[in-house]
């Protein structure tokens, strides 16, 4: 049974800054079993591991709350920070803050998770759906194409810049720079002061999935095209084509890239030469993120099947079938939490 606390503001959690630093989880080798399943009252847009035994849930109606993995009674505090839906959020594990955006309310909130209080709230006309945290600067896109650089401590405006073209992606890239993707295939690198560093034009569909590490930006689109970009110089290193749409966010692990296609295939690729190391063929669409856990990859098939693969050779370690299609998934220290199409949230525990 879920118990909803009477307090209407803030999150029900007790964490320190050290708790928010996620170390590498144990390898999920063992026998998977369901520890518990509960029915959520609203459909979640976000399910994310937060710290200790807490997971963060943000629903489409605009509720924000946490759940405790270890408790048989799921004690929850419902919090409605806005009158309307939440469009985007950022968890800053370096400061213990949660940033929430409502484009329908045109508002942005900074919440201190350590002291359980609101730091500041700012009204931003025409606020869009893209945000990024670059060092201590919060980047916010307006629907007008203007990017605002805000001081993350107080919400004050530091810089602003008008971007030509429709922005379809925005993210922090190492080291403390901003990546901007536009619908015309433009890829841009900016400093946290919104000064341009480099610009690259590539042939890629709008709204690609992308990821980055200290050296590279990897982008993939709905035609199966993959672009590997040097994130310091903004140069295209090489490109690949897997001839099937890619909707699932990519996984980088050292010099290896792991990706999944809409046809249910998972590939391991060597980024030194672009060669395919292995292929695993499953059944059905993959549109959830590939999750890395030391030497393994967790793959969620939309129809309800989870598969754990070895990163070195793609061999299957175990699989688990749920009764309904999977909508959300997040790794936790001893397993995985999933939400299905019936709004059922389940903790699949994997112990040696």
Model-derived segments and their meaning:
Residues 19-43:
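A short helix->beta-strand "capping" segment at the edge of beta-propeller domains
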Residues 34-38, 73-80, 117-122, 156-161, ...:
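A short beta-strand motif characteristic of beta-propeller blades
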Residues 62-65, 71-86:
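Well-ordered, non-transmembrane segments within structured domains
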Residues 68-72, 112-116, 151-154, 191-195, ...:
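Short loop/turn segments that connect beta-strands within beta-propeller blades
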